[in-house]
Amino acid sequence: MVCARAALGPGALWAAAWGVLLLTAPAGAQRGRKKVVHVLEGESGSVVVQTAPGQVVSHRGGTIVLPCRYHYEAAAHGHDGVRLKWTKVVDPLAFTDVFVALGPQHRAFGSYRGRAELQGDGPGDASLVLRNVTLQDYGRYECEVTNELEDDAGMVKLDLEGVVFPYHPRGGRYKLTFAEAQRACAEQDGILASAEQLHAAWRDGLDWCNAGWLRDGSVQYPVNRPREPCGGLGGTGSAGGGGDANGGLRNYGYRHNAEERYDAFCFTSNLPGRVFFLKPLRPVPFSGAARACAARGAAVAKVGQLFAAWKLQLLDRCTAGWLADGSARYPIVNPRARCGGRRPGVRSLGFPDATRRLFGVYCYRAPGAPDPAPGGWGWGWAGGGGWAGGARDPAAWTPLHV
């Protein structure tokens, strides 16, 4: 359920401050550590609050606590009359319901059913435990506490460990409306990246000279090596920019999401399964690669899965292989001669002819499936610790030109 909410006036905010006091954390990050929140009330009734950091960090499939505590005069109001409500901010004035509790009655909504519950760590604890975290859980959450007369609320931001990757489909660059960019990311095991995630990726070295949609409807691109074809010698309009020679985020602002077309910047997180490479005795067209993965109880890996395996599981393979969208790519953690450049990254050969061009294939196997048996296909795994099935050291393979 999504609802719009009107802003409270100053009087209402002051009234809330005298009644129910909600504590959440405004800055910083933690990784599942228990929060300690102290509340001190002076004789005059003024309140001094200390809170723990309000940004929590998890990953896909993880379990996280969104911290929230409250305090008020229990003698005047019983705890059974307090309503606790969690919502997710989907737009500046739009919220979707996550969880609500009134006394012993608890209810989770939508995709949060079966995954969300109160921590229940004593009186005044409104913290929410969220299990099996998904990509869609990323974002800001509001914790609201209400008694008979007053209410107060605070925000907690849930961040995810992961990787940002630029994407365009076979049709070429600058072909996606905003809605099409959302679908393209979802098809490649991702979501549209946020501006904060793109900024973090830029700080981590991402350099990409094509503009793409972000989840807030803006269009930006990150430049770490300023050059004239990529917006000149300085960034504009976003953090890290400002026209200096150090690069930054080039920002086109908010664009018409149904008429204008750009690429997409997608975000993905930890893989529940793993990616491995199958190398046939002879390279195969795309249709043969798909059959080979299926024979191993796997599917052709998606672009986001390959990026996650490269970034988070350190998959390093100096051989191009088919991916599910028909592109051919390969992941490099340790740059070396004849492997496509001096920087780590996922190299792309674009979208080769699916019937005439021949490659191996990157496969993705879901959790619980057995390891592939070495045989006619060489194979590797996302841990990057070695290679079986008679595969040669990647550094000795035929050079790839990208």
From Swiss-Prot:
InterPro entries: C-type_lectin-like/link_sf, CTDL_fold, Hyaluronan_bind_Proteoglycan, Ig-like_dom, Ig-like_dom_sf, Ig-like_fold, Ig_sub, Ig_sub2. It holds the Pfam family V-set. Expressed predominantly in brain. Its main location: secreted. Residues 1-29 form the signal peptide. Keywords: Disulfide bond, Extracellular matrix, Glycoprotein, Hyaluronic acid, Immunoglobulin domain, Repeat, Secreted, Signal. PROSITE patterns: IG_LIKE, LINK_1, LINK_2. Disulfide bonds join C68-C143, C185-C266, C209-C230, C293-C363, C318-C339. Glycans are attached at N132. It is found in: Secreted, Extracellular space, Extracellular matrix. GO terms for cellular component: extracellular space; perineuronal net; synapse. Residues 46-161 form the Ig-like C2-type domain. GO terms for molecular function: hyaluronic acid binding; structural constituent of synapse-associated extracellular matrix. GO terms for biological process: cell adhesion; central nervous system development; inhibitory synapse assembly; skeletal system development; synaptic transmission, GABAergic. Residues 163-268, 273-365 form the Link domain. PANTHER family: AGGRECAN/VERSICAN PROTEOGLYCAN, HYALURONAN AND PROTEOGLYCAN LINK PROTEIN 4. Essential for the proper localization of brevican (BCAN), mainly as a perineuronal nets (PNNs)-type deposition in the brainstem and cerebellum thereby playing a key role in the formation and structural organization of PNNs. Contributes to the formation and transmission of inhibitory GABAergic synapses between Purkinje cells and deep cerebellar nuclei neurons. Belongs to the HAPLN family. This is Hyaluronan and proteoglycan link protein 4. The gene is HAPLN4.
